[in-house]
């Protein structure tokens, strides 16, 4: 994938308004006093091997998810990752999280993979975190989701799956009234368990979420998945995933981006 390292993107007021349309209800959470240790099956271990042989460690007691705001903290800062496989092996990938301005009092943020794409995220005050839309900086398109895609589900127990069906609309970035592609995605998130993860930034206790995507967007038939490890107070410490939905449309469908945290931000 060709990457041009641009650090900023200017978004006019009209574009911000379109991006921030369409919000959904919060997800309620609850707690428990015991947690099960779950060993990964072979197919999951094989998929995670792209991270490197010593990244995924022992299973830990896995409790119900009750603090998504801590597992994916939304605070301003910069995080750095190292890509561990593929054409960009060894490349440093920088991520910046910033508060979104002009949001009429709503708690909205944007997360930018520098030079690649920007995600717009909502936080409802009760821990529910949702993906509203994203901008592909290479292809100059905006992708919007109706309803929004939950990134984390409070209350999930080990082995639980949550499924969301969403309408996907892809617009031209510089003419957000021009609909280029439309389709539907069924997104399933499964809480696999808790695991010790060792990355260049340190050793962390994490929860592992497996995601799967099935559907059709424009000419692209989507059957794919990914894995993300979250650590409390840090966010994503390792992942094997396709970085954004428009990758299905414009890039090699087999390409995923495994990465590990090398520098944490937002402290």
Question: Which residues make up each language-model segment?
Answer:
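Contiguous hydrophobic, core-forming segments of folded domains
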Residues: 103-170
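Intrinsic disorder/low-complexity segments
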Residues: 1, 20-22, 252-256
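Acidic, serine/threonine-rich low-complexity disordered tracts
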Residues: 29-123, 171-267
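Solvent-exposed, flexible loop/coil residues
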Residues: 5, 155, 208
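Bacterial N-terminal signal peptides that target proteins for export
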Residues: 2-13
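Bacterial Sec-dependent signal peptides at the C-terminal "C-region" and cleavage site
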Residues: 21-31
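Bacterial N-terminal signal peptides
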Residues: 12-22
């Amino acid at each position: 994938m060709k990457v041009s390292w641009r650090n900023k993107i200017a978004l006019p007021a009209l574009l911000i308004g379109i991006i921030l349309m369409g919000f959904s209800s919060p997800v309620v959470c609850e707690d428990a006093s015991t947690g099960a240790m779950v060993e990964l099956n072979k197919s999951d271990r094989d998929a995670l091997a792209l991270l490197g042989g010593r990244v995924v460690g022992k299973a830990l007691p896995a409790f119900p998810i009750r603090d998504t705001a801590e597992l994916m903290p939304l605070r301003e800062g910069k995080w750095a990752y190292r890509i561990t496989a593929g054409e960009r092996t060894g490349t440093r990938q920088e991520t910046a999280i910033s508060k979104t301005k002009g949001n009429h009092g709503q708690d909205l943020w944007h997360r930018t993979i520098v030079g690649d794409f920007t995600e717009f995220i909502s936080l409802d005050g009760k821990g529910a975190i949702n993906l509203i839309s994203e901008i592909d900086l290479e292809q100059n398109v905006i992708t919007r989701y109706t309803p929004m895609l939950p990134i984390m589900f409070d209350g999930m127990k080990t082995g639980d799956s949550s499924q969301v069906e969403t309408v996907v609309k892809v617009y031209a970035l510089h003419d957000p009234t021009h609909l280029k592609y439309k389709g539907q995605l069924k997104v399933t998130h499964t809480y696999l368990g808790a695991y010790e993860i060792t990355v260049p930034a340190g050793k962390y206790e994490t929860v592992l979420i497996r995601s799967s995507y099935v559907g059709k967007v424009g000419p692209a038939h989507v059957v794919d998945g990914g894995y993300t490890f979250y650590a409390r107070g840090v966010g994503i410490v390792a992942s094997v995933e396709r970085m954004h939905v428009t990758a299905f449309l414009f890039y090699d469908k087999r390409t995923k981006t495994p990465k590990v945290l090398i520098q944490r931000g937002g402290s």
